[in-house]
Amino acid sequence: MSSGGLLLLLGLLTLWEVLTPVSSKDRPKFCHLPPKPGPCRAAIPRFYYNPHSKQCEKFIYGGCHGNANSFKTPDECNYTCLGVSLPK
C-alpha cells in the first residue's frame, strides 16, 4: 500500500474513533448507578444517565450524599456516558 493510502487509512481510523459513541463496555461504571437524590432538602436540577432508556434524564438532587451519576448539564452527562455532545 502506498504512503498516501496508509495516511488516508490512518485518517479514517482516527475520525472513526472520534465520532464513535462510547460503547456500553467502555462507559464508566458509575453511569449505570441509579439517580440518588440524597437525604438533604435542596432542590438542585441534575442529570443522570439512564441505562434502560439509553439517554440522560433530569432528576432533583437534594445536595448531599449523591453518587457519581449526577451531572450539572445534559451535555456533560451525554459526553461522559454516551461519548457525544448535543448540538448547540
UniProtKB/Swiss-Prot annotation:
Q: Where is the BPTI/Kunitz inhibitor domain?
A: 31-81
Q: Where is the signal peptide?
A: 1-24
State where it is primarily located.
secreted
Would the keyword Secreted turn up in this protein's UniProt record? yes
Q: Which cysteines are joined by disulfide bonds?
A: C31-C81, C40-C64, C56-C77
Tissue note: Expressed by the venom gland.
| Keyword annotations from UniProtKB, A to Z | Blood coagulation cascade inhibiting toxin, Calcium channel impairing toxin, Calcium-activated potassium channel impairing toxin, Disulfide bond, Hemostasis impairing toxin, Ion channel impairing toxin, Neurotoxin, Potassium channel impairing toxin, Protease inhibitor, Secreted, Serine protease inhibitor, Signal, Toxin, Voltage-gated calcium channel impairing toxin
Source organism of this protein record: Oxyuranus scutellatus scutellatus (Australian taipan)
* Superkingdom of the organism of origin: Eukaryota
> Where found?
Secreted
What protein name is recorded for this chain? Answer: Kunitz-type serine protease inhibitor taicotoxin
Concerning InterPro entries, the annotation shows:
Kunitz_BPTI, Kunitz_BPTI_sf, Prtase_inh_Kunz-CS, TFPI/VKTCI-like
Q: Which SMART domains match?
A: KU
Subunit structure, as described in the record: Heterotrimer composed of an alpha-neurotoxin-like peptide of 8 kDa (AC P0CJ35), a neurotoxic phospholipase of 16 kDa (AC Q7LZG2) and this serine protease inhibitor of 7 kDa at an approximate stoichiometry of 1:1:4; non-covalently linked.
- Name the residues of the propeptide: 87-88
